[in-house]
Amino acid sequence: VFALSIQPYINSSIIIQLLTVAIPALERLARDGGEEGKKKIQSITRYATVAIAILQAVGYYFMMKNYSLLEQDGIWVALVIIVTLIAGSSFVMWMGEQVTEFGVGNGISIILFAGILARIPNMASSMVTGVQKWSAIKAGTLTLDSLTSAGYTETQAQSYLDSALSPWGIVLLIIGMLLLIAFIVFINDAERRIPIQYAKRQVGRKMYGGQSSTLPMKVNMSGVLPVIFAQSIASLPITVWTFIGIPKEGTVSYSIYNAIDTKSVIYMVVYFIMIIGFSYFYSSIQFNPVEIANNLKKQGGFIPGFRPGQPTVQFIQKVLGRITLFGAIYLGIVAICPLIVGKVINNGSLAIGGTSVIIVVGVALETVKALENQMLMRQYKGFLE
């Protein structure tokens, strides 16, 4: 029922946000429409979600048909499967919106968070299996010959043996994951603060202004969105290929399939480039240097050493470009590092994707902050005190 999960909503959000930049009418609606404009865009996103869910549900039906997973087939069976998948995806979208409106934090992020945590038992099981393989290899009971005699091909047997993990390998994986989480937490809170000075002005007998402040610019301004969207687009060819059927070994199609597989080097390079591109795209949407400079000018503020107006805009754009580049490279490295580890140890089930790690850490931090704010609003002590 929930096989499509929240993916149609994520894909529709990508499309609508790209169209918001490309279509002037949508851009005006997002910029000048206020709360009503946001509701209209949200409504358009819902309709787009249903449309994408229909396409993906049809794809899932044909995938099950190609792999002979259906005991019965026919127009009514197809209709029931497609409608059920669409209903499940729509329900997940509705549930996420309810959590956002009445709960704590972003509902869609929390659903993704829960889905990622649900995979941890499988990862732990893979670790145990990997250690058992390693022990059997050391004891001499698991060899290439024993696997080939059991019906494995030589390639399959070698791949099976390569997925073995030593206890020290598990320890290094856990330490690496903890260091990665600590790095994500550090970068998530890192920011560049631009000093702001406000000119003094006299109103009647009172003197106003003269104080100093800062303009904070987060290093990872766009959050996890570039990674989510880049992953959705980069994995689209493989998803489509899975729907129509994986090609047979030894064919040209199979070679192309392997070349763009999510474990291939080509996929990692394309994925990394897309993350950088989406990071710049979202930074330009969320932070407008011209608007910031105009607001500072209206409030009598200025950046020391730069005149109000175009010089201020150019300085903010320069700082924004540097921060965005650093944040984009950080996101790219964090996203592909677990993929590289999974490729090296030949055990993809152990490598929770960098996307997943960023989502888990980011959602956890945002939820803690949201709970802190809720408790402080009710005059209770902080959540961590």
Q: What are these regions, as identified by a protein language model?
A:
Residues 1-385:
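N-terminal cationic and glycine-rich segments that engage phosphates or anionic surfaces
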